[in-house]
Amino acid sequence: MPVPASQMWTVATYVLKQKLKGRKQYPLVLMLEPLYRCNLACAGCGKIQYPGHILKRELTPEECFRAVDECGVPTVAIPGGEPLMHPRIDEIVRGLVARKKYVYMCTNALLLKQKLHLFTPSKYLTFSVHMDGEKEHHDLSVCKEGGYEIALDAVREAVRRGFRVTTNTTIFEGTDSQSVRAFFSGMMDAGVEGMMLSPGYSYDKAPDQQHFSNRESNQSMFRRILSNRDARWRFNMSPLFLEFLMGKRNLQCTPWGMPAYSIFGWQKPCYLLQDGYADTFQELLDSTDWSKYGYESGNPKCANCMLHSGYEASAVDYTFSFKGIFATVRAMLFSRYRDEEAARQVAAENQRPALVQIDALAPRPTLTGAQVAAPAEMATGIEKAFDYRGDVTVTLGTGEKLEGYIFDRQQKADLAASTLRIMTKPGQKITVRYADVAQLSFTGRDMADGRSWEAWIRKYTERKAAGEKNIELAPEALD
């Protein structure tokens, strides 16, 4: 069984209580981001592209506990950044376990083996190790040669010491089905409890914006991968979510189901999109126009999203309905999903596509210098600054200059009522009215510049040809 019975019971009773209370919008899993620092520089990641002063900041254990208590979820996922780089991560985990929360610590496992002694095996703690496929594919995906072997060694050691271990795999466009299926079997051999997987999502702030599939391609890809399953494979996910990935079931996005909390606050509207932040969970629920998000909304940013952060909670919610219970039981009893056409398609992949392909793509423009110096340009300029992956300098009408990262903006029909929020280098969160901005300059470096998939592959192939080993795209160096 991929999930302990006690955990299933806890989640089931929690969901049923929400339904009995008539709550339509309730959280299921808190995505708790205690820091954005990382020891990898994955081109497809949109969570680490921040200036150095932001990467240095982290949540305290007390702030983490308040967020968990505030939303009341039974399960907490700790992504990052790399959580094991947090100097008090063991204290955070102990506090959550003491609250009897089921904790999934997401990690690339580069530090896991050397830090296992900080933790105690418990049914409440699971290490969710990021593994992006077999060795070559994983190393290229995380932009670090040798990363797979380090992670696999840590997985085996954690299993040996009695920890719960799952894997978390992101599947990108062009992924070879045979390779993924072989990877699943390899993870079962390593002794993991279960596997989680999701299609890639093109984060606005990720260096790589090209290697992501549309919804139809995702469904076709997951149909090939998940049909005709090996009986040994165990997935740490709702079976209805897996059917959704395969195109066998339609689900509506519930972005409030997996809210994200970080140094900026409660992220609007979900873990993936960054349309601003709320100071409290209730403010997140009340101030977000949820009709603007999800596949049915027509929002282009949501058109191809099929990620667990939007749809896993939807699948769990549907499970606790009359039809959902029978659908879940059927999916669990008949989990092989025999599909002759899918089998033929997998067999036809007798020549695996080259993993290293460099596309001729136009680079994302880098913004420098003064962008806004006239009131008529203010709204457009601030929107660019909000999307920018670096520091800006805001000059006020008084002549005062604020240098830092714009992490939120509330644009109203009346610009006089519109505001932005900037986290300055000293760490202050300052609210500024649009009307008070005299000039806006992009003075900081674009933190994703030169870190695209193409830049990484070019570096990898050149250095590989020169005979180098342990090639990597190094993370941002902090002072």
Predicted regions and their residues:
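Radical SAM enzyme [4Fe-4S]-AdoMet core and its adjacent flexible, acidic
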Residues: 1, 59, 99-102, 123, ...
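Conserved alpha-helical substructure of the radical SAM core
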Residues: 2-118, 122-123, 328
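Short loop/turn motifs at secondary-structure junctions and domain boundaries
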Residues: 24-25, 248-253, 384-386
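Flexible mid-to-C-terminal extensions adjoining Fe-S/redox cofactors in radical SAM and related proteins
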Residues: 26, 267-348
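Short, intrinsically disordered, charge-biased short linear motifs at domain edges
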Residues: 28-33, 237-241, 284-295, 390-392
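Short cysteine clusters
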Residues: 38, 42-45, 253, 265, ...
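A short acidic/small-residue loop/turn micro-motif
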Residues: 52, 274-277, 409
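Conserved RNA-binding domains used in RNP assembly and mRNA/RNA metabolism
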Residues: 347-479
